[in-house]
Amino acid sequence: MTTMDHRFPSRIFVNERTSITREQLNSLLETYNVFYENQKNLHILYGQTEDGQLIVEGMLDIFWGVKRPIQLKIQDEKQISSFDLLKSPETFSSKGRMTRWGEFDDLYRISEMDKTQALAPEARHTPEDYLSCYSVLKQCADEEPESPLLYRTVSEAALVRKRMRAPEMYRKDRMGTLAKHRASINGHVYDHETSIFTPTFGSETKVRANSIMKTEEVIKQLLQKFKIENSPRDFALYIIFGTGEKRKLKKTDVPLLQRLIQGPSKSNARIFLMDKDAEEISSDVAPYINFHFSFLKSILQRLDEEEKMEIERIMAKFNTERAFILKCLQSKRAAKTETTV
């Protein structure tokens, strides 16, 4: 990795209070990229904008940790990259091997299995095929509409509801319509009929971020990637450390630089997308969160006992000192009275 040009600023700000030197950034980048030596697409590299501003760019791992349901958009929208504000595509040199925005977006795709089923020969379909459906997270792509009520025969008075095979053109049109309404998160496909869901806690995704993007911009980028309607203000980014500590990123934080500072190992720290009101966990409390409730209760009981003992010790010392002071005052008063007489 080449050393940064001397024209770049001497310090790079992680937030309004924290900054790192160019040398520190060089070291962090080198450590990070060596860790992913065999995965060039995960490297974090730097370049400069049209106005000469230093910019660091790469893939950012984000883990799902939301509890509230999220709503997928019904219609896809053209994604607007934050890099449109930069000098593109000349922002980074070819030597930097910077990847394009659309790459590694394999989490957003249409189920090939559904397409194969929809285009399969008619002879392979059985009545059970049209009665089957997938789980809540994956709806059947070629689910056929029901026909009107039909009489079975003239002699039979009972009415039955019959499944009928729709025309081939109709099925293809329906498949195309469903394809427009789908997004996929970690391999699970959703359509407009099951577009409200909660992602599995701890499932991983990636977004392309840079050192110009603050916390809210990264959240917007993630929601845009999966076509999620919820407002970015409903969510926040948290760093969860291996110790159990959980810290909320500020609006002024640069998540990509925070990832660099924590190092490449996910066992040390992970960035989660969570509800904005998720509770933080301090470093003092973190060591106790994995203990059993009965054990924690015994610790509290022991602390209460120690507190009572300490209070009793302090009160005893206070009473002793108070008695000594009163005794001294009384002796001085007695001596003064004798002198006066």
Swiss-Prot record:
Domain of life of the source: Eukaryota
PROSITE patterns: RA (PS50200), SARAH (PS50951)
Keywords per UniProt: Apoptosis, Phosphoprotein
SARAH domain residues: 285-332
Keyword Phosphoprotein belongs to the record: yes
InterPro entries (UniProt xref): RA_dom, RASSF1-6, SARAH_dom, SARAH_RASSF6, Ubiquitin-like_domsf
Residues covered by the Ras-associating domain: 190-278
GO-annotated biological processes: apoptotic process; positive regulation of apoptotic process; regulation of apoptotic process; signal transduction
Any Pfam family the entry gives: Nore1-SARAH
Modified residues (Phosphoserine): 155
Task of the protein: Involved in the induction of apoptosis. May act as a Ras effector protein. May suppress the serum-induced basal levels of NF-kappa-B.
Subunit structure, as described in the record: Interacts with MOAP1. Interaction with activated KRAS is still a matter of debate.
Protein name from the UniProt record: Ras association domain-containing protein 6
Species assigned in the record: Rattus norvegicus (Rat)
